[in-house]
């Protein structure tokens, strides 16, 4: 289908650096775009902490690793450091290893210092509740690998699940699950579960690809994360939603901006009446 093109370019540098100002006159689409971009940037840092700290945990002794029950998460403290915690949860949190990760350089150092034990319990409970709901939604036959991201605010804990990079080299999109829990993780208070179908690509640096969400009138968090996380694997990535085609452009100093093309179907031409 051909479309009349209307272009809107929005800088996302302010989002990347944690500012929350929205462009004047923005509509609901743009508002959600800025919110989801901010979340995706936090996910990128969370994922980086996972990578650098997981390398360190491989160096632990067999005795130490025997206490690891699969509960891993990280949180950012008031000093701007990430705490990556690996352990097990069974009504209480048992720590296997605790790493401090610099939020700028992502340098990793193991620490035997204190950590937020209450938060560790709440994060573990939140993860277990959200994981159970995710598995119920996707069903027992689903075997796709997912990454999880856990964030907190003063009033809630949010657990996000996005498809991970798969062992067969495919980068997958088409499903994402987001759960908001009470601050003590005693219950799920809001749910956003999206599944269309799993679709994906392998790395093609010279090809422009499209990730398609034509059933949505907004750009989901998973689409933003996919573009930011895998942008070097392709020439360009386009996000196609109901009303927009969106991509990322970079200006001076590699500053990113969203490039939105409004999808407006052209008016059909009236057929000329033939003379009798």
Predicted features by range, described:
Residues 217-276:
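Hydrophilic extracytoplasmic domains
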Residues 19-82:
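Start-of-domain marker
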């Amino acid at each position: 289908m051909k479309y009349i093109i209307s272009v809107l370019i929005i800088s996302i540098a302010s989002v990347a650096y944690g500012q929350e100002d929205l462009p004047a006159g923005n509509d609901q689409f743009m508002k959600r775009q800025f919110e989801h971009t901010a979340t995706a940037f936090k996910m990128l840092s969370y994922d980086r902490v996972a990578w650098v700290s997981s390398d360190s945990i491989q160096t632990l002794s067999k005795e130490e690793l025997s206490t690891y029950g699969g509960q891993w998460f990280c949180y950012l403290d008031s000093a701007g450091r990430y705490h990556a915690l690996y352990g097990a949860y069974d009504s209480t949190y048992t720590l296997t290893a605790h790493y401090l990760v610099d939020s700028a350089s992502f340098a990793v150092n193991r620490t035997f210092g204190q950590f937020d034990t209450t938060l560790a319990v709440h994060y573990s409970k939140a993860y277990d509740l959200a994981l159970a709901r995710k598995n119920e939604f996707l069903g027992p036959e689903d075997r796709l690998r997912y990454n999880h991201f856990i964030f907190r605010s003063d009033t809630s804990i949010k657990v996000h699940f996005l498809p991970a990079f798969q062992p067969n080299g495919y980068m997958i999109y088409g499903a994402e699950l987001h759960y908001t829990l009470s601050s003590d993780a005693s219950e799920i208070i809001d749910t956003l579960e999206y599944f269309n179908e799993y679709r994906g690509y392998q790395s093609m640096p010279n090809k422009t690809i499209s990730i398609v969400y034509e059933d949505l009138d907004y750009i989901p968090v998973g689409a933003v994360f996919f573009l930011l996380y895998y942008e070097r694997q392709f020439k360009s990535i386009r996000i196609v939603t109901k009303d927009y085609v969106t991509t990322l452009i970079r200006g001076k100093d590699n500053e990113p901006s969203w490039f939105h093309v409004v999808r407006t179907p052209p008016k059909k031409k009236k057929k000329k009446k033939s003379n009798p």
